[in-house]
Swiss-Prot record:
Broad EC category: transferase
Catalytic reaction list: [(1->4)-alpha-D-glucosyl](n) + ADP-alpha-D-glucose = [(1->4)-alpha-D-glucosyl](n+1) + ADP + H(+)
UniProt: ADP-alpha-D-glucose binding residues: 15
Entry protein name: Glycogen synthase
EC number: 2.4.1.21
Entry annotated with the keyword Chloroplast: no
Record's keyword annotation contains Disulfide bond: no
Keywords attached to this entry: Glycogen biosynthesis, Glycosyltransferase, Transferase
Gene, per the UniProt record: glgA
GO MF entry, a single one: alpha-1,4-glucan glucosyltransferase (UDP-glucose donor) activity
Length: 475
């Protein structure tokens, strides 16, 4: 089967969050038995230099704000084809210092137009799998009735709160027909279109990244027209739980760890926890923390409203009052949050038990996973979440809000701790206190939580099998 994965992120090349990880992991799993090609836009300032040999390169035309030229360069990478599309005559759209900007609907619609033109020139494509609203226009462009043939279209919602509202005039700058454009337009305001809405109507099948989040989406009334769209397509909509690549996230082989360990040590809990402790010592030395503070809780997250930044700040107070260590590693995406957390970071530079790191440093993050006893994920909503899956893999017990994919993967008293209420901090503080107390006073119970998490299947094989089932059902 020829499968194309279209996205604006794919680890390790270009990544801001979990989207890039999922696109890479799913593509790699599918490529074992199928011909998989990943389509990405080229970001001149962000892409690493490629060491892989070029398989193919050709220039082609596409229409967006007039006739434009693009170059598709294909590489072989880990059994997959990676095709990077450079918008030669609109190069400024992606010559940015960050993946996302304020002009994303323009930039990603231009990429979608180029991707559609590229796909239409290929000999045979069975499935085009589109990831999130960024490539929503691609669904409509591949459904145009004048095309001689078109592949089956799968669209995955990675975060329903981001939808791609834009002007209808912008989408009309592509080759999409008036009828196709109507799928994107809002009835209440035809001058406004929504990339997500059109993708829902123009795709053969729609998925999201966990079963619980699928139910959250069906019960979301924040925009009644989007709600009507998803309800009209609910018979071809489901949640498929994300998984992680055990070859990438593996404490037995992770070069960033000071000391490696794995599930084979579950037969010798004292040895396992000694190795976790050695990683903790290495991290404390690196960050200037005092070894007398334990357990170590971490937060590894984008610091945005969805992720519960107010709970992250509350956790600092709880750690101070209860004498345990807390490391927050994350990136802020708005100026006010950046200001608040920078001030906190500066005020805590000499703290013996608290550190805030406001950038993403992959080796450091991996060491944090290996060193931490628990990982806190206080999200207001969470489509799936990958950090709890990675944490469990590294023997780091998840403390989460029971929502979306977190509810699907973390069970209180089985492999982690949970809280529900977000109207105040009482439920959250109770969860933290329960976790710290269990760590300090009930080592046998703590080991059972760690063991359950480390032995949990990564879910990647299951995820790939579910998607293959969807693909096959459409062919």
């Amino acid at each position: 089967m020829k499968i194309i994965q279209a996205s604006v992120e794919c680890a390790p090349f270009i990544k801001a969050g979990g989207l890039g990880d999922v696109v890479y992991s799913l593509s790699k799993a599918l490529s074992i038995h199928h011909d998989v090609e990943i389509l990405l836009p080229f970001y001149p300032l962000l892409f690493p230099a490629f060491s892989s040999q070029v398989l193919d390169e050709h220039v082609f035309a596409y229409n967006f704000l007039g006739r434009q030229n693009a170059t598709a360069t294909s590489y072989r990478y880990e059994g997959m084809t990676l095709t990077v599309i450079t918008l030669d005559s609109q190069l400024e759209l992606f010559s940015t210092s960050t993946i996302y900007t304020e002009d994303d609907t323009l930039r990603f619609s231009a990429f979608s137009a180029a991707a559609a033109a590229y796909i239409q020139k290929l000999d045979k494509v069975d499935v085009v799998h589109m990831h999130d609203w960024h490539v929503g226009l691609l669904a409509g462009l591949l459904k145009e009735p004048h095309l001689p043939s078109y592949p089956k279209r799968i669209f995955t919602i990675h975060n329903f709160s981001y939808r791609g509202y834009c002007s209808t005039q912008l989408l009309g700058a592509s080759e999409i027909s008036d009828f196709g454009l109507s799928n994107y337009q809002l009835f209440r305001d035809p001058s406004t279109s929504v990339l997500l809405k059109g993708a829902l109507y123009c795709s053969d099948y729609i998925t999201t990244v966990s079963p619980s989040y699928a139910q959250d989406i069906l019960n979301d009334y924040s925009d009644y027209e989007i709600h009507d769209a998803i309800m009209s397509r609910r018979h071809v909509f489901c949640g498929i739980l994300n998984g992680i690549d055990e070859n990438i996230w593996n404490p037995e082989t992770d070069p960033a760890l000071a000391v490696r360990y794995g599930t084979h040590l579950l037969k010798s809990p004292d040895v396992l926890f000694t190795k976790k402790e050695e990683n903790k010592i290495a991290l404390y030395e690196k960050l200037g923390l005092s070894l007398e503070y334990s357990p170590l809780m971490c937060v590894i997250s984008r610091i945005v409203e969805q992720k519960g930044p107010e709970f992250m700040k509350a956790a600092i107070l709880h750690a101070m009052e209860n004498s345990y260590a807390l490391v927050i590693a994350g990136t802020c995406y708005d100026q006010e949050t950046q200001r608040q957390f920078t001030n906190l970071q500066e005020s805590l530079t000499t703290s013996p038990n608290i550190r805030i790191i406001l950038d993403y440093n992959d080796p450091l993050v991996r060491l944090i996973y290996g060193a931490a006893d628990m990982i806190c994920i206080p999200s207001h909503f969470e489509p799936c979440g990958l950090t709890q899956l990675i944490g469990m893999r590294y023997g780091t017990v998840p403390l989460v809000r029971s929502t979306g994919g977190l509810a699907d993967t973390v069970a209180a008293g089985v492999n982690g701790f949970t809280f529900s209420h977000t109207d105040n901090f009482n439920d959250f503080f109770h969860m933290l206190s329960q976790a710290v107390s269990t760590y300090r006073h009930e080592p046998d119970v703590w080991f059972q939580l760690v063991e359950e998490g480390m032995l949990r299947p990564s879910g990647l094989t299951t995820m790939a099998a579910h998607y293959l089932g969807v693909y096959n059902s459409l062919l």
